[in-house]
Amino acid sequence: MEFFNILQSACNDVNLDFNDKKYNQFISYKNLIQEWNKKINLTAIVEDEEIIKKHFIDCIKIFKSSPIGEAKSLIDIGTGAGFPGIPIKILKEDIEITLLDSLQKRINFLNIVIGELQLKNIQCLHGRAEDYAQEIQHRQKYDIAVSRAVANLAVLSEFCIPFVEKGGYFIAMKGPSVEEEITAATKSIEILGGKIEDIMKIDIEDTDLKHNLVIIKKVRETGKRYPRKPGIIKKNPLK
C-alpha cells in the first residue's frame, strides 16, 4: 500500500472517491506498463514513484475539468500506453471509453490491461484519427474527446474536435507553456466548430511538473471536409 495515500490525496483534490479496488487496479496497471515496456516503447518513465506521479496523478488532475465528471462517453486520441483513458476509467466506472492509437502493439498492450483490470464498457481502436473521425459511428458521437499527445494544439484540434458532439468538449492536456500554441490554434479551433472555454493550470504535487488543461467547447458541427486526409493536417495546420 506504499502509494495509496499519494493516489488518495490526488483523488481528494478533485473530489473523487478512492478505495482498495481502485488502488489495486492502478498498481496492476503500473506493473503491466513496466513489464511491457521491456518489449515495446510505451514510456520513458519507468520507476514506480515516477509512474504514479507523472502519469497517474497527472491523469487524475483532468477531473479538475467539470465536463469529465458529467460525461457519459469519451474518446482518448493517441492514447499510447492508455493515458489518460485508463486512469479515467478506473476512477469513473460508468463512463464508456474508446482508446484510439495508430500502433497495433500498443493496442495489444491496452487489451491486456483491460482484461487484467477487468474494466467494462471500454474498447480499443487501431488506426488513424483522421480516418475514424469520418466514420458515422464515431463522427460527432462523443461527449468528450481527450488527448495527451505531443502534437501542437492546431493539429490536435483537427484530430479531435470532429469526434465531439455539439455541446461536448475537447480537453487537451498540454505542457506549461501553452500561450503561443493557443494563439496559433484559435482560428483552427473556430473553423472546426470549437471555442476555448477555459485554460486550467495544473501542478503535480512533489514534482516539478506544471501543466495546462485547455478546455474547448464544441459550439457548432464540424464541416464535412474536416479532418482532412492523412498527412495533410501535420504538414499544413489550419490557420
Swiss-Prot record:
What keywords are assigned to this protein? Cytoplasm, Methyltransferase, rRNA processing, S-adenosyl-L-methionine, Transferase
Q: What is its main location?
A: cytoplasm
Under the heading InterPro entries, the entry gives: rRNA_ssu_MeTfrase_G (IPR003682), SAM-dependent_MTases_sf (IPR029063)
The keyword Cytoplasm is assigned to this record: yes
Q: Which GO-annotated molecular functions does the record name?
A: rRNA (guanine-N7-)-methyltransferase activity
Q: What is its EC number?
A: 2.1.1.-
Q: Which Pfam families is this protein grouped with?
A: GidB
Residues annotated for S-adenosyl-L-methionine binding in this entry:
78, 83, 129-130, 148
**What do the Gene Ontology cellular component annotations say?**
cytosol
The task this protein performs is described as: Specifically methylates the N7 position of a guanine in 16S rRNA.
Which family does the record claim for this protein?
Belongs to the methyltransferase superfamily. RNA methyltransferase RsmG family.
Protein's name in the database: Ribosomal RNA small subunit methyltransferase G
From which source organism is this entry?
Answer: Clostridium botulinum (strain 657 / Type Ba4)
Whichever gene encodes this chain, its name is rsmG
